[in-house]
């Protein structure tokens, strides 16, 4: 697994894909330490991708993982735009349909796990299908 340096220029140390995979792995471990159970990672369907799908009790949690070196331009959480939210909602809708579910039949939420520098922020229920 790629090492995540505390500071530094990822372009010199890791490819963008490797850095993304490393942050997603760190997010998974962190969420598991908080009691969530892993279901899937990097779920791709036509039109989008979900970084992590976890379970929190009976709730299916779709997780967007974001990293920014600093909060200078709003930090990691600010990078989850309305457009990105719509893509995540669409992707989750298609994934649920493949599982014979829907937003009406499955208790679910959308979380954002934001790494800004060395800080982690967990935004539970950051947005929903009514946003």
UniProtKB/Swiss-Prot annotation:
Signal peptide boundaries: none
Tree of life domain: Bacteria
Short name of one Pfam family: UPF0102
InterPro entries xrefs: Restrct_endonuc-II-like (IPR011335), tRNA_endonuc-like_dom_sf (IPR011856), UPF0102_YraN-like (IPR003509)
One GO MF term attached to the UniProt entry: nucleic acid binding
Protein family according to the UniProt entry: Belongs to the UPF0102 family.
Protein name: UPF0102 protein YraN
Organism: Salmonella arizonae (strain ATCC BAA-731 / CDC346-86 / RSK2980)
Gene name as annotated: yraN
């Amino acid at each position: 697994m790629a090492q995540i340096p505390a500071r530094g220029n990822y372009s010199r140390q890791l490819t963008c894909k490797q850095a993304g995979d490393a942050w997603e792995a760190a997010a998974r471990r962190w969420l598991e330490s908080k009691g969530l159970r892993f279901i899937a990672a990097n779920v791709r369907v036509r039109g989008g991708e979900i970084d992590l799908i976890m379970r929190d009790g009976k709730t299916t949690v779709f997780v967007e993982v974001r990293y920014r070196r600093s909060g200078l331009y709003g930090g990691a959480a600010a990078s989850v735009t309305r457009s990105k939210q719509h893509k995540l909602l669409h992707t989750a809708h298609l994934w649920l349909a493949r599982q014979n579910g829907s937003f009406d039949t499955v208790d679910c939420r959308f979380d954002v796990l934001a790494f800004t520098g060395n800080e982690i922020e967990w935004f539970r229920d950051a947005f929903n299908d009514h946003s």
